[in-house]
């Protein structure tokens, strides 16, 4: 929101029945300008309708994966097909769940739509996600099914050498199941989907959220192709270089190729692109706007696993808060840096204040 919109919201909070001409007199602007600002506030979801009923905080709906993450780190650099000493860690995970968890840490109202099995993992995931502050009433428990699981093996340098993602359960998150949350989704300030969803579920989300800003996490180059025909519906996209190649349809061998690919996606309708690079820097591009590279701030790094989920949560948060494009990018990079400073997928010290304290370093 801009300063004028904030002034109008403050007036409406004090007197929801005030007339537009009275607001105009108070702010010394024309009534038509007041009407235009109010229309903008309604489009942004800050005002629900006549009588100026205010939405105190827009909420986000995340549609995506919730799964158990099992991560093993071998004590050697090149693990072979044998048993190796090392450490194994289990935690709540899933791209959608992790982003929702981070949004809750940042103080946003967030709902998660997903599916779990009726096993121990499913119960543990629901409880931990609920404790984090995420509304999980839209997570459906499927009887006789096993909860999705992600298994990753890393070497002693914390480089993932093998990962297996068993998310077959998500195939049962059908439009029929999702229909129970259609009203919740229709009134969201932002909808975020991850590409673990089936093509049918993605179609349901894109169709129902046609008038709502859509954020998409491509997840991997194996799943990014699912959204190639939905680019015109996407507001914000965060691909890696391999994922960008899939969406563009050509190899990227230089910065010039990357820029051309980004512009091609803009031409197809994507408003904001944040290309996550191997060195943790981010190439940021706004349609008909700025293009720049941001590097990660100097900050403690314990584990990079999950930092991109912190980044995406930062993008959603800053969009809902009305940040500029550049400030949104800087805030998201700061969130990613805080995420890397913990061995946990969701750093419990992540907060809006802590991220803002790092922004000047970005």
Question: Language-model segments: what does each one mean?
Answer:
Residues 1-20, 26-27, 32, 36-55, ...:
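Conserved phosphate-binding/catalytic region of the ribokinase-like
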Residues 3-4, 8-13, 18-26, 30-113, ...:
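Glycine-rich phosphate/adenosyl-contacting loop at the front of the ribokinase-like
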Residues 43-45, 171-176, 216-222:
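Short gly/ser/thr-rich secondary-structure transition/capping motifs
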Residues 56-57, 78-86, 105-189, 355-362:
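Conserved N-terminal subdomain of the carbohydrate kinase-like
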Residues 66-80, 127, 283-293:
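Acidic-glycine-rich active-site phosphate/pyrophosphate-binding loop
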Residues 87-95, 140-144, 305:
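Active-site nucleophile and cofactor-binding loops and adjacent substrate-binding regions
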Residues 103, 240, 308:
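Short, conserved phosphate/pyrophosphate- and ester-handling motifs at nucleotide-, phospho-/glycolipid
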Residues 190-260, 280-282:
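Conserved beta-alpha-beta core of the PfkB/ribokinase-like small-molecule kinase fold
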């Amino acid at each position: 929101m801009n300063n004028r919109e904030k002034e109008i919201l403050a007036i409406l909070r004090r007197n929801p029945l005030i007339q537009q001409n009275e607001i105009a007199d108070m702010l010394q602007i024309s009534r038509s300008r007041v009407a235009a600002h109010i229309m903008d506030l309604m489009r942004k979801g800050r005002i629900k309708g006549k009588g100026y009923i205010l939405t105190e905080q827009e909420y986000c709906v995340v549609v995506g994966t919730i799964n158990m993450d099992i991560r093993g780190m071998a004590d050697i650099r090149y693990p072979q097909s044998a048993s190796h000493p090392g450490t194994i860690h289990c935690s709540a995970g899933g791209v959608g769940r992790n982003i929702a968890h981070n949004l809750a840490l940042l103080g946003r109202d967030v709902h998660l739509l997903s599916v779990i099995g009726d096993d121990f993992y499913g119960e543990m995931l629901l409880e931990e996600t609920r404790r984090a502050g995420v509304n999980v009433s839209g997570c459906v428990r499927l009887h006789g099914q096993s909860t999705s699981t992600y298994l990753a093996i890393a070497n002693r340098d914390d480089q993932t050498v093998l990962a297996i993602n068993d998310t077959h359960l998500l195939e049962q998150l059908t439009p029929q199941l999702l229909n129970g949350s259609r009203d919740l989704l229709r009134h969201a300030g932002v909808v975020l989907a991850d590409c673990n969803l089936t093509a049918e579920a993605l179609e349901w989300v894109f169709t129902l959220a046609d008038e709502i800003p859509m954020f998409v996490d491509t997840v991997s180059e194996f799943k990014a192709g699912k959204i190639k025909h939905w680019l015109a519906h996407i507001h914000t996209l965060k691909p890696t270089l391999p994922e960008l190649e899939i969406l563009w349809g050509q190899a990227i061998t230089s910065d010039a190729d990357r820029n051309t690919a980004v512009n091609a996606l803009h031409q197809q309708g994507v408003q904001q692109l944040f290309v996550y690079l191997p060195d943790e820097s981010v190439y940021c591009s706004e349609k008909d706007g700025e293009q720049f590279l941001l590097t990660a701030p100097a900050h403690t790094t314990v584990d990079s696993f999950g930092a991109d989920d912190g980044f995406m949560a930062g993008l959603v948060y800053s969009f809902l808060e009305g940040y500029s494009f550049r400030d949104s990018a800087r805030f998201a990079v700061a969130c990613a840096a805080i995420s890397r400073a913990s061995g946990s997928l969701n750093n419990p010290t992540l907060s809006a204040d802590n991220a803002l304290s790092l922004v000047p370093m970005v």
